[in-house]
Amino acid sequence: MGDVVHTMPAVSDIARHRPDARIDWMVESAFASLPAMHPSVQRVVPIAWRKWRRNLLKEQTRVTIGRVRSDLRAEPYDLVLDLQGLLKSALFSSQAKGLRAGYDWASAREPLASVWYQQVATVDKSLHAVTRSRMLAAAHLGYTVQGEPNFALKMPDPSWMPPSPKPYVVLIPGASRPEKLWPEERWVAVAKAVAARGLEIVWMWGSKDEASRCVKLAAQSDGEIPPFLSVEHAAAVIARARACVGLDTGFSHIAAAFGVPTVGIYCDHEPGLVGITGKAFVASVGGRGKSPESTQVIRLLDDALSSAMRRSTW
């Protein structure tokens, strides 16, 4: 999910510099609602690779993949741009009809992906993911990256909101891998700090394990736990928050993309290349072997809340 969010500014750049361009976006089906929130995306092409790879020998899977391939090849594109630089993204982009473009061998996250491209560009691998995507698009479409990243997301309508009318802070304690998790007692300390500041808490989750973790944390502190929400409806709740504190997960990046003051907590890798990025206050804290203390996160949360109050008075 984070990769999808990080690509949004590149799409905004393309639309700005090539206003006559029609932009279609191929994406994992679970995240298809995210590109649909960008006003410059005309069509979203969903693929279910996570599901297909477990059932490649089944006839239905092959039939479904064949339909997607036929759909892609029915549309002649001037440029098929792979902004991920992975083998799987290169493979699927090669199914579309058009000039295939991407990173060169030295720049791609998976160098072998560059073999599939007909046109390549060099982009420094030490840059943030958002900047890399913007620079790759600029290199292949002949313009220069200018200004701050513009995520340009349309705010979706919510299907659920916390019952209290008070402003709320979204806490996101779940992650895709155990190594990313932050100690529970530190989450409880942050939650109590939020409550002490007169704000509501919404514990956001996306899987059964994450829901269980939220229930456990809320029992030790306070807060509302929403029912299961689609990515679109979760984004609607996150986008309306006063601030957000979350792990290195897609929901945290969504918060920052919507301009919510956001503190990102990193526990298993350095945040430099994938740190929290957005137009409002953002902070990325921690790193591999450097799990931050709750006091540090609470200080940053106070900075985030202060920035939110300043923005509300503009």
Task: Spell out what each predicted region is.
Residues 1-314:
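Catalytic machinery of carbohydrate-active enzymes
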